[in-house]
Amino acid sequence: MGLKLSGEDIYNPGQGALGDAVVQFGGGCTGEIVSSQGLVFTNHHCGYRQIQSHSSVAANYLRDGFYAPTLRDELPNPGLNVTIVEEIVDATDYLKEYLEKVGEQDPLVYMRRGYLRKVAKQWYLEHRGALKAGVALDMAPFYEGNRYYLFVKKQYSDIRLVAAPPSCIGKFGADTDNWEWPRHSGDFSVFRIYTAPDGSPAEYSAENVPLKPKYYLKVSGKGVAEGDFVMMMGFPGTTNHFYTPSEVRERLEVDNQIRIDLRKVRQETMWEEMMKDEAINIQYAAKYQGSTNAYKNAIGTSWAARKMNFEAVKQQMVDRLLAYSKQYNKPEYAEAVAKIEAMVKERATLRALAKIYDEGLWRAVETAKAPLIESEEQFAKLRDPQAATQWYDEVVLGYFDKDYNKEVDRKVTAAMFKAVLEYIDRVTEGQELSIQLQAPFGIRRWMESKGETKVLGAIFDESIYFDKAKMVEVLSSEGGEVAYALDPVTLLAFSVREDMKTISKALSEYDRDFALARRTLLQGMLEMDGEMNLWPDANLTLRYTFGKIQGYVPRDNVYYGAQTTMDGIMEKWDDASPEFYLLPKVVDIYCNKDFGRWALPNGKMPVNIVATTHTTGGNSGSPLVNGKGELVGINFDRNWEGVGGDIEYLPDYQRSIILDVRYLLLVLDKYLGADRLMKELDIVE
């Protein structure tokens, strides 16, 4: 197809290969090392929280962009980690032997990543020796636990912000264009990995030096054209290619619909407040973006699943397995299918309640997630006023931090209480629940007896959580436990947590049988089709996908090409819109055609491209390389028509949306004036 690399060029543990330049950025994104000094490219939205954390009204890097002219000006980001996979080992046989040795047979135990990491540490001790500083281990189940792979990784924790475009470039189109093609976003940010002077991973220190990587990507100044071969590497999060028909229905009618309905309420309230005040807009920018991203994904997945009739597609998959089961006398495979279908139906109401609590309270009402004092021992320690003061400063204010706004939370809470109560009534109508829930009863009784204004006033105006002196006084006083327990925020947060535990416990009754049935289902699929014909579902481990640059037909008589240009930015430009405004310098670059050597042969400036590669959440920031392994783009999204690919790959519709690296180079070169970075990059024509 156009690949000019050998297997060892792509993965060659210890020797330096393409895979060594691919990093897991934070907990849910990908990035790539692009220089001999540890420079990392990822998406603007992957670095958004870091950019936001360094922003203020006086120095608004979200709005204006950021560039560090020297190494000394690069900004540290506590809590941000970057990991590089150094070795991948098939650990299936080792795990089986280990489980037999310790007598562990419960899949709910041994399929957990935490348990598997303990097994990985034992493997490392036996095969590599003592665990070295900076080494991180992961072991993950594949094919629902029919295979296990172990990942030896190097983890770096001194990661500094180097450059970021203004949001009018990095987030152009914002939520309106999210999941959409054609697209015109310069969705990138630049960081650098630092190490101790000896090259080992280290916490932030002024003495640290830029990483000297085993391998880094050269950057193609030539770019790509329609039909060209491309390959992508990254850490995709979750896919569900082996859903049964009932699981498809559950995803659409329960999971997605509840997420869509409740996030819409939250987002509309947040947006109204964000548009009133620039400071609030900065505070809630990342929260809003995170919410809308999953919201639009749910809408797109449901649309695709219905349009492509995924339920029927999965029925065909199941029918093939049932026929195989009958032909080869393998009744366990038919039994597994029947168990899955039955359990999905039985757990429907509990599943709906879990999603309502998660989307409507836990993720939406910030006071519902407030830190609690949950033991007598902890309370006894906090009787000391000094300890209580320290707990308030570090824990309470650590949660209700600079990105929290009480008035925004007040308005969101009012909207969510109403929406959640209505939703619970709807999904439980005519049913006698096997569990008792505290929060809905308490909130309803509270609202009916006191009224909405007084209830919200009690939470946000009277709670000791928002008054340090009162909190310390209560905690350090005799009998303070009672006053603390009766505080409105304590009551809300405690009841929500207890209800979620109750629901989770009831749902967990299905977990073991469900996990075993899923494993048997996949065992049958592997036996029937062979491992080389089935890719395992994504699980945040390093994966490769290949394809070509290619447009698509989204509907009758409409064709979307594979490349967009700055012409499209100017067509969408609207300074009255917070999503499509442009800073004057961007307009000047376009009007003066100041594109340098990054323009297409026809003089137009490339911005985004699409490819047939198969991606999902976690692939944000993934490097797109040509057949020679040179960086040609950075993945940042998928198209609306292809979002359902998490359940069933759609080659005619599904496209990865990618930042053309030539637009990134233009922004660094012409907008940010990042001369030292341009010299640092290895740009090939």
Segments predicted by a language model, with ranges:
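Terminal presequence/propeptide segments associated with secretion/organelle targeting
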Residues: 1-685
